[in-house]
Amino acid sequence: MPPEGSPAPSRKPRADAERNRLRLLEAARAAFASGGTGASLEDVARAAEVGIGTLYRHFPTRDALIAEVYRNEAAKLYDHARELADSQPPIAALRTWLLLFVDYLSTKLILVEALKAMVEGDSARLKATSGEQLTAAASLLVGRAVASGEISADGLDPIDLLRAITGVAMAGASPDWDQAARRMVDVLINGLRR
């Protein structure tokens, strides 16, 4: 029994509850991608094949759902970096991850206005945590590619790669910005090769 006044130990969520949560996040990401952050939460629940009560049990507000979609996308990108580091040659892992970063930006650009409208402190913490994950992931993959001798380390800061791709995304108001960002990935990778 925990000492008096200490928080009760948290239990791991049931497998079905976690599965529902992940289905809700994926359904919300897809709904926000097609209809913006104002998409119907009833449609999100329906697409996840759960009731609206289940959605609200996991995410009591629209903002909570938006924040968790954002957090989840950043966490998935971080996890992909580690998986790619273990499964692909360094330069291929870096390129694949940067292309996944473009997909992440697609979600982020949809959520950015809603994130700005959130309580400033919450939004800042969310962005800081996600930024730390992305920095760690980029550093891991760039470090492997440099260590393998496939790319040059001359003045390279892994964040510069993310900034270059993000710059294309932010500057590109055109509907094909993601294709331009994917081309930028190849330009960057080719420019870094030894």
Can you name each region flagged by the protein language model?
Residues I66-E73, K108:
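Alpha-helical DNA-contacting segments of helix-turn-helix folds
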Residues E68, R82-S106, T135:
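Hydrophobic alpha-helical connector segments
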Residues E49-F59:
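Short hydrophobic/aromatic patch on the recognition helix
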Residues M1-A47, A64-A67:
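Basic, helix-initiating cap at the start of DNA-binding domains
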Residues A128-S130, V146-R163, S174-A180:
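All-alpha amphipathic helical-bundle segments outside canonical DNA-binding/catalytic cores
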Residues M1-A8, T135-S148, A171-R194:
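C-terminal peripheral helix-coil segments that are non-catalytic and often amphipathic
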Residues T61-I66, L77:
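Short amphipathic alpha-helical segment with a characteristic S/N-K-E followed by hydrophobic residues
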Residues A93-S123, D160-R163:
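Amphipathic alpha-helical segments used for helix-helix packing
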